[in-house]
Amino acid sequence: MNVGISVPLPAYFVDVGFMARKVEELGFESFWCAEHPFIPVHSKSRFPGAADGVIPESYRHFIDPFVALARASGTTSRIKLGTGIVLVPERHPLLLAKEISTLDLFSGGRFLFGIGAGWLREETELMGGDFDHRWTQVRESILAMKELWTKTEAEFHGKYYDFPPVYSYPKPAQKPHPPVILGGGAKNVLQRVVAWGDGWLPNRITPDELRQSRATLDRLAREAGRDPSSITISVHGQPADRDLIHRLLDAGANRVIVRPATVKSEAEMGAELTRIAETVLR
């Protein structure tokens, strides 16, 4: 049973190296980190995860996912290491491609590239992203990175990113590249997954909704000439509810990612992860 663990917020109370090692020892399948480089003090954007739209105070306390996963890779040897998610419009593909390929190489091909376009307009725009066309920008960035990962001499010419032939090394351990897993529940997300992705990373979704989405995703894949089984679904941000996890897996999820409670010490985190393992894995 593929169950992953994500880092709770605030994300720096417990060493992620310790946490990832414990996750692996307990038999979980993957370890996930998310990102927001900052949260604006003044924002008109509504938080999509709350009825009142208020951004939680905990969202001020993310860590850099690539530094965190590099730390986690050094204390583990088997578990997958995922971003859940990286805000692609806020990073340049020439640098992002190298960060990913380096992490994938040094981790032995264990990286899962969970991506998103973001919901916080002020953040996206301060980082140079085009918020109103952010998924168009994400697509272009991914296509550019695929060139960098797979070509000896890579070049790309688009609206947002334009570069002449360059050498970009190292290449990732996974071939042709780490899986690109699209987050979110936007209207066209499943079409995007089939067109240029390798998986889907939904959050707020019920087993019935997932079953319908899996059927749609499989149909779109067949219509595009792709093997439906090559496209994964990873359900993010779930409670440690064994019955719910089984229903999500039965509905078509390939993995379910559980978020532990926030704790402030390694001893507390070890106990929390053990509790989750005994609840959902045993």
Locate predicted features.
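Active-site-adjacent structural elements that line small-molecule/cofactor binding pockets in enzymes
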Residues: 1-282
